[in-house]
């Protein structure tokens, strides 16, 4: 169970690292090398994004990675094969991140079933609110997968509690409104937001959107349980290749 795995890791570390890759960017072989490098550098769990043409929650860095991966002709089936390969190779939790159109076209039940067979632990689907997710929730629960839901800075406390009733594994907290990869003000206001998040759920909290260096990770310690690094890792890959990714991950804590 994902939550149990996270809590066991938190008994040994004061903050966990979750990274985000776009499957097939820049190609499948490099994607596998990035996963290997991140795991060896100490990443605790990882989001594997299935490329999509209109990734509404993602900023320019991850948007470009989605577009470039799609331009190679990558398919959803290839993404499942990749996920199965990395889940078999490395003993950390892997999650899918994608958009509902992918699940709808594949078939929600079939998608959840294949996730389980591949050894995945759960999924983040940013454009699917729990009120519209009955089929998804039923399929995820049936196959032992954790549906991860999102708290935004403007989510009311009452709504946070409703979301938490449906979520499993952890809650993904956005550090700010907007899309991924832009500048985030890691300050007292964000700390207050995380206090509200913590009060609304017993699930572990992950914080993403703008986490880029050790100072940001240090700020998150004691306020959330998981620091999520996405766009910055892709920037580092673009600028310095796979070896630079290892150095970057090791620099975060």
From Swiss-Prot:
The active site is at 47 (proton acceptor), 58 (proton acceptor). The keyword tRNA-binding does not apply. GO terms for molecular function: tryptophan synthase activity. It catalyses: (1S,2R)-1-C-(indol-3-yl)glycerol 3-phosphate + L-serine = D-glyceraldehyde 3-phosphate + L-tryptophan + H2O. InterPro entries: Aldolase_TIM, RibuloseP-bd_barrel, Trp_synthase_alpha_AS, Trp_synthase_suA. Gene3D superfamilies: Aldolase class I. CDD domains: Tryptophan_synthase_alpha. Pfam families: Trp_syntA. It comes from the Bacteria. It is an enzyme of class 4 (lyase). Keywords: Amino-acid biosynthesis, Aromatic amino acid biosynthesis, Lyase, Tryptophan biosynthesis. GO terms for cellular component: cytosol. Pathway: Amino-acid biosynthesis; L-tryptophan biosynthesis; L-tryptophan from chorismate: step 5/5. Its EC number is 4.2.1.20. SUPFAM superfamilies: Ribulose-phoshate binding barrel. Belongs to the TrpA family. Tetramer of two alpha and two beta chains. The alpha subunit is responsible for the aldol cleavage of indoleglycerol phosphate to indole and glyceraldehyde 3-phosphate. This is Tryptophan synthase alpha chain. The lineage of its organism: Bacteria, Pseudomonadati, Thermodesulfobacteriota, Desulfuromonadia, Desulfuromonadales. The gene is trpA.
């Amino acid at each position: 169970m994902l939550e149990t795995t996270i809590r066991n890791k938190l008994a040994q570390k004061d903050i966990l690292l979750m990274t985000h890759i776009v499957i097939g960017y820049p190609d499948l072989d490099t994607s596998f090398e990035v996963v290997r490098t991140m795991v060896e550098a100490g990443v605790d769990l990882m989001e594997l994004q299935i490329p999509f043409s209109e990734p509404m929650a993602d900023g320019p860095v991850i948007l470009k990675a989605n577009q470039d991966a799609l331009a190679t002709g990558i398919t959803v089936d290839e993404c499942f094969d990749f996920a199965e390969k990395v889940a078999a190779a490395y003993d950390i939790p892997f999650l899918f991140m994608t958009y509902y159109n992918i699940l709808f076209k594949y078939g929600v039940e079939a998608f959840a079933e294949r996730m389980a067979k591949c050894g995945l632990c759960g999924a983040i689907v940013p454009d699917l609110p729990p009120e519209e997710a009955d089929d998804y929730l039923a399929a995820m629960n049936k196959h032992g997968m954790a549906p991860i839901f999102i708290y935004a800075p403007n989510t009311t406390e009452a709504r946070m509690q409703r979301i938490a009733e449906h979520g499993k594994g952890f809650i993904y907290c956005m550090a700010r409104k907007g899309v991924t990869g832009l500048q985030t003000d890691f300050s007292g206001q964000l700390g207050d937001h995380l206090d509200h998040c913590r009060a609304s759920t017993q699930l572990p909290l992950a914080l993403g959107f703008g986490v880029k260096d050790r100072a940001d990770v240090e700020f998150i310690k004691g306020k959330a349980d998981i620091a999520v690094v996405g766009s910055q890792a892709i920037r580092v890959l673009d600028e310095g290749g796979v070896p630079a990714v290892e150095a970057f991950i090791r620099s975060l804590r």
